[in-house]
């Protein structure tokens, strides 16, 4: 039954060697993001909720960029297996152009109409007032972040995930130090509060971009070919749109859907407490899921390269099944660790530091239990969508599997329970488990079918 787990010697070592730098990168980013939330939370739960609301449109930008990054990786990982560096440059050029244009448009909208953007998320005018200066500044930081993220994604796709780990580590360290200095007014700087958090984010993105651009100029593995970067050609643009558009649509729809969860919460009773609980529980969960996305991204590189070098469909299916089961078991252990850490460390010692109300703390606990309970399914579904299906070029199926449960099941149920029936908030929190419960059986059928294996570098 599990014969597919018998892979060639060194397969699992290669998987975890690729995943480890990505996991470390995710842990650094998430841990320092948790510290970021913690430092803003020290100003008060109202300030923390305002920043969470302000980050909803930022989250959409991040998801669009991640979609472009992932869509580029679908092509790059297979071109890497083929050894076609010129085509890799063409893909990067298209990704940089689109990412830079989209992030600039968002930044301008948030700079000139910040309050209008925030009013789309919440009707709490106090949160809008606090979040307006934050969103006006932080929007520009994601122009630089979008460009560096596309390049870092390329390096990950050519089996160099360590680069992203180092760049994001330096960036997030800069962000944490900047937060401490600018939020609380240390080292002679004025205490800027929420505005200081935005300024620190902008500074960290400048550092991130400078490191990525400097490395790109010196990289010899895939050296920059300016003619290919600036003139990628119509054929490559057609292929990029064909394979990347569904991934971009996937991440955009998923990002908008997840942002609507915050919007729904923002229009419920006790919205401030509910959003604060969601922010803290989500930060805790992201620490655990850092490992899941490390496995998923490593799987995308391995699957894509395997198909790119011309391996058989059967070989691709065996690898897909092996990495999905590995992710499921790994996530099962992560869920146990999350619960143990919450009971022994976070709940008694860390949560009180956030100054949450009793109701918010109770809702936070319910959310953490739900996140930990579905962690194994989260591991399987994320690796199946981000790693296996995308790595295999099956981008349309991954679009449907990733978004149908969220848009057609989870969000309607949340609207019904939270806005119509107005159930207790603790009961509403249980809805966050629905998405992964629904994805798993459909994903299993798709993986076993083998219809997801497509050699997109030879499909001209």
Go through each PLM region and give its residues.
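Transmembrane helical elements of multi-pass membrane transporters/channels
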Residues: 17-33, 137, 171, 204-208, ...
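Helix-terminus/linker motif at the lipid-water interface of multi-pass membrane proteins
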Residues: 27, 31-49, 118-125, 181-192, ...
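Hydrophobic/aromatic residues within transmembrane alpha-helices of membrane transport systems
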Residues: 24, 36-40, 51, 76, ...
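N-terminal transmembrane alpha-helices
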Residues: 7-38, 42-43, 59-71, 75, ...
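Alpha-helical transmembrane segments of multipass membrane proteins
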Residues: 34-38, 108, 150-154, 177-184, ...
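Short runs within selected transmembrane alpha-helices of multi-pass transporters and secretion channels
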Residues: 69, 73, 138-156, 164-175, ...
């Amino acid at each position: 039954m599990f014969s597919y787990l018998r892979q060639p010697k060194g397969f699992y070592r290669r998987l975890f060697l690729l995943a480890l730098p990505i996991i470390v990168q995710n842990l650094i980013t998430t841990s320092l993001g948790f510290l970021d939330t913690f430092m803003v939370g020290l100003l008060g739960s109202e300030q923390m909720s305002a920043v969470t609301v302000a980050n909803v449109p930022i989250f959409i930008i991040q998801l669009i960029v991640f979609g472009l990054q992932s869509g580029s990786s679908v092509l790059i990982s297979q071109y890497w297996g083929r050894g076609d560096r010129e085509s890799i440059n063409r893909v990067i050029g298209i990704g940089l152009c689109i990412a830079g244009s989209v992030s600039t448009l968002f930044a301008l909208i948030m700079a000139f109409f910040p309050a209008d953007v925030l009013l789309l998320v919440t009707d709490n005018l106090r949160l809008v007032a606090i979040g307006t200066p934050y969103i006006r500044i932080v929007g520009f930081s994601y122009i630089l972040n979008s460009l560096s993220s596309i390049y870092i994604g390329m390096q990950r796709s050519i089996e160099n995930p360590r680069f992203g780990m180092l760049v994001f580590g330096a960036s997030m360290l800069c962000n944490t130090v900047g937060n401490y200095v600018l939020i609380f007014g240390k080292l002679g700087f004025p205490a800027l509060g929420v505005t200081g958090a935005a300024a620190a984010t902008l500074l960290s993105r400048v550092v991130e971009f400078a490191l990525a651009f400097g490395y790109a100029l010196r990289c010899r593995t895939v050296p920059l070919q300016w003619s290919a970067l600036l003139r990628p050609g119509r054929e490559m643009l057609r292929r990029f749109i064909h394979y990347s558009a569904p991934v971009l649509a996937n991440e955009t729809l998923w990002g908008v859907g997840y942002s609507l969860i915050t919007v729904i919460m923002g229009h419920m009773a006790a919205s401030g407490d509910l959003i604060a609980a969601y922010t803290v529980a989500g930060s805790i969960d992201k620490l655990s899921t850092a490992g899941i996305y490390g496995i998923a991204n490593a799987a995308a590189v391995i699957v894509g390269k395997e198909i790119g070098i011309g391996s058989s469909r059967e070989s691709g299916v065996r690898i897909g099944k092996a990495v999905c089961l590995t992710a499921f078991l790994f996530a099962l252990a992560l869920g146990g660790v999350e619960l143990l850490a919450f009971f022994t460390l976070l709940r008694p010692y860390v949560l009180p530091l956030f100054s949450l109300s009793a109701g918010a703390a109770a809702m936070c606990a319910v959310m953490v239990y739900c996140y930990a309970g579905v962690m194994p399914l989260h591991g399987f579904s994320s690796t199946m969508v981000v790693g296996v299906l995308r790595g295999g070029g099956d981008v349309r199926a991954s679009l449907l599997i990733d978004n149908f449960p969220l848009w057609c099941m989870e969000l309607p149920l949340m609207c019904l329970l939270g806005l119509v029936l107005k159930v207790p908030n603790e009961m509403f929190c249980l809805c966050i488990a629905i998405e992964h419960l629904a994805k798993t059986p459909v994903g299993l059928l798709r993986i076993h079918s083998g219809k997801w294996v497509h050699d997109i570098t030879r499909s001209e």
